[in-house]
Amino acid sequence: MNVHMYENTATQKNLDICKSYHIKIVEPEIGELACGYQGRGHLSDIEDLLDAIEYATSPHPLAGKHVLITAGPTQEALDPVRYITNHSSGKMGYALAKVARQLGAHVTLISGPSSQRAPYEVDVIKIQSAQGMFKQVLSYFDFQDYVIMSAAVGDYRPLEYSNQKIKKKA
């Protein structure tokens, strides 16, 4: 779809009418369009489309529930270049978030660095360190019906952070 077609008043009014009937709209993404323009109108990611279809055709036993999930590794900085971490990919936490969303829950995913694709309609909060994860979990914890702690949080952090790259000692 062309960005100008999508932004047209008639198109927007028709989308609003559909939404007023609780019809789920998978919005187009922002990107390069076939006409050469940049803007909203690019076909949504196929995974998002499939997730929306699966959600629309699934039962929702967790509807109205809030689920907090942690995922991925944490990184503890030693200096501006190096950090301590582990090999966690975050796959399990992201998969749990996707399933909880498909079951109708409002899902908040607090994730360390991960290359996993954010699940459709899941609120993702990116963090780096164990302290960052701790603070985010505490800020959301009291509002959750379920909490799943699947992150691979680091066991250690340095006593001191060096503002400059630590030199090798021969």
Regions found by a protein language model. Give the residues of each.
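Glycine-rich phosphate/diphosphate-binding loop of Rossmann-like nucleotide-binding domains
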Residues: 12, 16, 61-129
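A glycine- and small/hydrophobic-rich beta-loop-beta segment
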Residues: 113, 121-170
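Short, glycine-/small-residue-rich phosphate/pyrophosphate-handling segment
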Residues: 1-30, 40-53
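Flexible nucleotide-interacting loop at or near the entrance of a catalytic core
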Residues: 50-63
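Glycine/threonine-rich flexible loop motifs
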Residues: 4-8, 78-85, 156-170
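Short glycine-rich anion-binding loops that position phosphate/pyrophosphate groups of nucleotides
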Residues: 31, 72-76, 151-158
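A short acidic, helix-capping loop that chelates divalent metal ions and anchors anionic groups
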Residues: 4-6, 33-37, 78-79, 118
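General beta-strand structural signal in soluble alpha/beta enzymes
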Residues: 25-28, 109-111, 149-150
